[in-house]
């Protein structure tokens, strides 16, 4: 896995709780639709679209853009895969589209503006690289009018019995 991913990601909730994710450099994730290369070992299937593997990505023939880093939530160890999207929430009364130019200056773009809130947006690094999006999270958090920045993380689904 390339070393340009942060070793740790911290996400603070509105209530001040912090969730920490630690990079698992011995793992990587990619589409589970792509046939496995010799020597690849599936550690876990996240869903129908993604699987986590235990072989260093550099030893495969796949392009770097096809693999994603794997993090572990602390202290549970639950796998988490950053998608490269960031949820950015601006202060009440600030429309996300008003901040488009400022977001673009830090190397990101507004990717999706959900209809249920004008003050929030899904943002992605203009390069399309997950590492660039993760690096931009701290910069975005420091922008005027930004209240919250959180990387989108894919997590294993948890099924509960209805008993």
Stretches with model-predicted labels:
Residues 1-163:
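Primarily auto-inhibitory N-terminal propeptides
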């Amino acid at each position: 896995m390339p070393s340009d991913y942060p070793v740790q990601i911290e996400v603070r909730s509105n209530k001040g709780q912090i969730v920490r994710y630690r990079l698992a450099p011995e793992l990587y994730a990619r589409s589970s639709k792509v046939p496995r290369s010799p020597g690849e070992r599936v550690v876990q299937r996240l869903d129908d679209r993604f699987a986590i593997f235990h072989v260093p990505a550099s030893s495969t023939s796949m392009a770097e853009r096809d693999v994603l880093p794997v993090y572990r939530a602390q202290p549970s160890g639950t796998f988490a895969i950053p998608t490269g999207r960031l949820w950015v929430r601006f202060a009440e009364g600030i429309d996300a589209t008003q901040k488009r130019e400022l977001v673009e200056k830090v190397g990101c773009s507004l990717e999706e503006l959900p209809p249920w809130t004008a003050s929030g947006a899904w943002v992605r690094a203009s390069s399309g690289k997950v590492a660039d999006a993760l690096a931009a999270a701290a910069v975005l958090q420091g922008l005027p009018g930004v209240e919250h920045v959180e990387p989108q993380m894919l997590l294993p689904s948890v099924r509960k019995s209805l008993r």
